[in-house]
Amino acid sequence: MKSVDHPVDVLPAEHSAETPGDARASESSLLISETFVSRQGEGELTGTESVFIRTSGCNLRCWFCDTPYASWKPEGTRQTIEDLLQLVAKSGVKHVVLTGGEPLIAKGIVSLIDQLRSAGNHVTIETAGTVDPGARCDLLSLSPKLRASTPDAKDHPRLAKMHAERRLPINTMKQLIQSAEATQVKFVVDSADELPEIDEVVRQLEIAADAVYLMPQGISVEQLDAARPWLEPMAISRGYQYCDRMQIRWFGNRRGT
């Protein structure tokens, strides 16, 4: 897989739970953790060659986050919108995935999305759906965070409180769904006990069952294989879809994939 390497700028810890704090920040540049070309490994576009642009910084703190370098300890470099547009154009790939961290908290993200789409690219936004900056995309890949995603309150009291307060703004999510050309809703599932909560979120979002994907929490093939026997039939029983994490099967759990 092709990747773009840049010097790393680690954010101060006091900024790590918010929109990245940087005196140089402007709407013409974004803090980018990494960019790479790979195959989409999750959801309805699985197997599609895509340019991935991972923004750094997140307003949530899922305990199982598989990209802590973009959330718990965000790092990256400032890149201009023009730099990112040129990177996509040079790749020759027409599907772009904006991911994170949480891409929708990044200053300049709406302008980047608009310009990518104006250039003829298909844009997927991978988001937890906690904020709505007014972006329009081709595919909204919405990942609502369930109660079990909250970090341990004993170890991280401030972050646990922040996460719990922010993780599930249903009205904001519905606005994002209304603005997108298409939507898939992906739940990271750690236990069968979470099914009633998933059902309730789906009901509140008023989303079709076949647009809902249940994906195992795990960063190894062994974890994925252990979850599938109970998670796949659970998804089917509700008319949902089972979602594997093919990037882990193809490449392992590593950056740039």
Swiss-Prot record:
Stored HAMAP family: QueE
Gene3D superfamilies in the record: Aldolase class I
Disordered as annotated region, ranges: 1-25
Keywords, in A-Z order: 4Fe-4S, Iron, Iron-sulfur, Lyase, Magnesium, Metal-binding, Queuosine biosynthesis, S-adenosyl-L-methionine
Binding site for [4Fe-4S] cluster: C58, C62, C65
Single GO molecular function: magnesium ion binding
Residue positions binding S-adenosyl-L-methionine: G101, S143, P144, K145
Similarity-based family: Belongs to the radical SAM superfamily. 7-carboxy-7-deazaguanine synthase family.
Name of this protein: 7-carboxy-7-deazaguanine synthase
Subunit structure: Homodimer.
Enzyme class: lyase
UniProt-listed Enzyme Commission number(s): 4.3.99.3
Binding site for Mg(2+): T67
Pathway: Purine metabolism; 7-cyano-7-deazaguanine biosynthesis
Residues given in the record as substrate binding sites: R39, Q40, G41, R54, T99
Domain of life per record: Bacteria
GO aspect biological process, one term: queuosine biosynthetic process
Domain called Radical SAM core: residue spans: 45-244
